[in-house]
């Protein structure tokens, strides 16, 4: 199997950590769409949002998603990539979509520990746990809709990678 593997989930779910480890295990390339945009535009996510608003950021996110999609690539998407129906359709048609699911409390803990994630602009202006509850309430149905497979992202990353490798092996057999 050489199709693109898309990692979806909220900020702090482990898309980058698990995506990198999965790509290494498979001998695939790894791309984080947020980092791709930051490098391409030479701006942080906060700067892009300040300059272009969330709508402009989401448009760039969609373009980045299509640009980086290629065989033998693991793509960590931005948490809001699923907000676009076109993105959800694109990912389902062009690869396998893995939803890394975690509770708002777990996500908030992880975000509080990660100084890089702390620099992301707030989506709601609320404290992080409340924000994650709101974000998950609105996005959970979209993550579920787009996902070919839903995995518990509260497990250690190496266990999640093993589960994905088993899924890929099963898909190959079919």
From Swiss-Prot:
<keyword id="KW-0057">Aromatic amino acid biosynthesis</keyword>
<keyword id="KW-0808">Transferase</keyword>
<keyword id="KW-0028">Amino-acid biosynthesis</keyword>
<feature type="binding site">
    <location>
        <position position="120"/>
    </location>
    <ligand>
        <name>ATP</name>
    </ligand>
</feature>
<feature type="binding site">
    <location>
        <position position="58"/>
    </location>
    <ligand>
        <name>substrate</name>
    </ligand>
</feature>
<feature type="binding site">
    <location>
        <position position="16"/>
    </location>
    <ligand>
        <name>Mg(2+)</name>
    </ligand>
</feature>
<keyword id="KW-0547">Nucleotide-binding</keyword>
<feature type="binding site">
    <location>
        <position position="32"/>
    </location>
    <ligand>
        <name>Mg(2+)</name>
    </ligand>
</feature>
<dbReference type="GO" id="GO:0009073">
    <property type="term" value="P:aromatic amino acid family biosynthetic process"/>
</dbReference>
<dbReference type="InterPro" id="IPR023000">
    <property type="entry name" value="Shikimate_kinase_CS"/>
</dbReference>
<comment type="pathway">
    <text>Metabolic intermediate biosynthesis; chorismate biosynthesis; chorismate from D-erythrose 4-phosphate and phosphoenolpyruvate: step 5/7.</text>
</comment>
<comment type="function">
    <text>Catalyzes the specific phosphorylation of the 3-hydroxyl group of shikimic acid using ATP as a cosubstrate.</text>
</comment>
<dbReference type="GO" id="GO:0000287">
    <property type="term" value="F:magnesium ion binding"/>
</dbReference>
<keyword id="KW-0479">Metal-binding</keyword>
<protein>
    <recommendedName>
        <fullName>Shikimate kinase 2</fullName>
        <ecNumber>2.7.1.71</ecNumber>
    </recommendedName>
</protein>
<keyword id="KW-0460">Magnesium</keyword>
<feature type="binding site">
    <location>
        <position position="34"/>
    </location>
    <ligand>
        <name>substrate</name>
    </ligand>
</feature>
<feature type="binding site">
    <location>
        <position position="155"/>
    </location>
    <ligand>
        <name>ATP</name>
    </ligand>
</feature>
<feature type="binding site">
    <location>
        <position position="79"/>
    </location>
    <ligand>
        <name>substrate</name>
    </ligand>
</feature>
<feature type="binding site">
    <location>
        <position position="139"/>
    </location>
    <ligand>
        <name>substrate</name>
    </ligand>
</feature>
<dbReference type="InterPro" id="IPR031322">
    <property type="entry name" value="Shikimate/glucono_kinase"/>
</dbReference>
<dbReference type="GO" id="GO:0008652">
    <property type="term" value="P:amino acid biosynthetic process"/>
</dbReference>
<keyword id="KW-0963">Cytoplasm</keyword>
<dbReference type="InterPro" id="IPR027544">
    <property type="entry name" value="Shikimate_kinase_2"/>
</dbReference>
<comment type="subunit">
    <text>Monomer.</text>
</comment>
<keyword id="KW-0418">Kinase</keyword>
<dbReference type="GO" id="GO:0005829">
    <property type="term" value="C:cytosol"/>
</dbReference>
<dbReference type="GO" id="GO:0009423">
    <property type="term" value="P:chorismate biosynthetic process"/>
</dbReference>
<feature type="region of interest" description="LID domain">
    <location>
        <begin position="112"/>
        <end position="126"/>
    </location>
</feature>
<dbReference type="InterPro" id="IPR027417">
    <property type="entry name" value="P-loop_NTPase"/>
</dbReference>
<dbReference type="GO" id="GO:0004765">
    <property type="term" value="F:shikimate kinase activity"/>
</dbReference>
<feature type="binding site">
    <location>
        <begin position="12"/>
        <end position="17"/>
    </location>
    <ligand>
        <name>ATP</name>
    </ligand>
</feature>
<dbReference type="Pfam" id="PF01202">
    <property type="entry name" value="SKI"/>
</dbReference>
<dbReference type="InterPro" id="IPR000623">
    <property type="entry name" value="Shikimate_kinase/TSH1"/>
</dbReference>
<dbReference type="GO" id="GO:0005524">
    <property type="term" value="F:ATP binding"/>
</dbReference>
<comment type="similarity">
    <text>Belongs to the shikimate kinase family. AroL subfamily.</text>
</comment>
<keyword id="KW-0067">ATP-binding</keyword>
